[in-house]
Amino acid sequence: MDTFLFTSESVNEGHPDKLCDQISDAVLDACLAQDAESKVACETCTKTNLVMVFGEITTKANVDYEKIARDTCRNIGFVSDDVGLDADNCKVLVYIEQQSPDIAQGVHGHLTKRPEEIGAGDQGHMFGYATDETPELMPLSHVLATKLGARLTEVRKNGTCPWLRPDGKTQVTVEYYNENGAMVPVRVHTVLISTQHDETVTNDEIAADLKEHVIKPVIPEKYLDEKTIFHLNPSGRFVIGGPHGDAGLTGRKIIIDTYGGWGAHGGGAFSGKDPTKVDRSGAYIARQAAKSIVAAGLARRCIVQISYAIGVAEPLSVFVDTYGTGKISDKDILKIVKETFDFRPGMIANNLDLLRGGNRYLKTAAYGHFGRDDADFTWEVVKPLKWEKPQE
């Protein structure tokens, strides 16, 4: 059997870039909760003892940006300089302006356009991907790396591993077999975890706890064997972390947010952007389309691309590739996709209920936007596709 290795990584919620994603999306949630028509393009950056929230926001909502930034940092666990940031005493700078009137006129006619008329907030191309290798219809390498990161946070917050600090990274290498275009996982080749920790714990204790409380509950036993390689805090020491260790910026973890290097990416980040920004809403509907194709049995693996022009409602192009796994031709699948999904930005927002705030976007900002079992992730709902199996 001819196999190959493929690797995906993840970072958990205390990573500086992910901290910024979460602050940006918490701001978006707060704006949408009070004003569903909010236009939000919110960026965040952070370094030692500093968080800056900046961008373009037009909203009727009364939002305390500084409070949102501090609350988000605190909820992650940044409660002292020792762990990388002190939420209550760090400096928070806010530089927010309104959306350009030129963009507002071209995209939503200063809120006068009907949903079906609303244009894309910018040009760009977005991808959706799905594969039958996991129940989530997501790549196994990405699913495992992401779940390891989430588990690190869980055992930190519930006290199972009290020596853990908020920052951490994971990486999983999976050995795969290509079965006529479909990806079949054979085994886990390598597991890498680098996690921030306090001064008191030894490397041996770290390795033992990570194996017992993080790896064991996450990675199914069938994928682990005596040859699986474990790199657990391979640099030896990771006490200084969070924004004290590295600067952070919104939108720098776009592969972690999506498919772990599988499929493709148009380059546009998600966090801090309202649904008129097709970087986000376009990628969400493309995932729903790809997932629905695989769930319907039309293909074992699929990628969908859509593209837009600023101010134009209809997509410029829609593309489907099933990597040779389709039960019918890609051309016929594309026809079904176009008949089933409305790719106009205003209609995506309506059909996926994307104008609702709360904490639904904050939830997306750590541990991936796709493959999540959560009612707020409306783009994960499979749409039934009508097709007839060809005669054998």
Curated annotation (Swiss-Prot):
Cofactor(s) annotated in UniProt: Mn(2+); Mg(2+); Co(2+); K(+)
Catalytic activity from the UniProt record: L-methionine + ATP + H2O = S-adenosyl-L-methionine + phosphate + diphosphate
Binding residues for L-methionine: 56, 99, 246, 277
Binding site for K(+): 43
Gene Ontology terms: biological process: one-carbon metabolic process; S-adenosylmethionine biosynthetic process
PROSITE patterns (alphabetical): ADOMET_SYNTHASE_1, ADOMET_SYNTHASE_2
Cofactor, free-text remark: Binds 2 divalent ions per subunit. The metal ions interact primarily with the substrate. Can utilize magnesium, manganese or cobalt (in vitro). Binds 1 potassium ion per subunit. The potassium ion interacts primarily with the substrate.
Pathway of action: Amino-acid biosynthesis; S-adenosyl-L-methionine biosynthesis; S-adenosyl-L-methionine from L-methionine: step 1/1
Family statement: Belongs to the AdoMet synthase family.
Subunit structure: Homotetramer.
Descriptive protein name: S-adenosylmethionine synthase
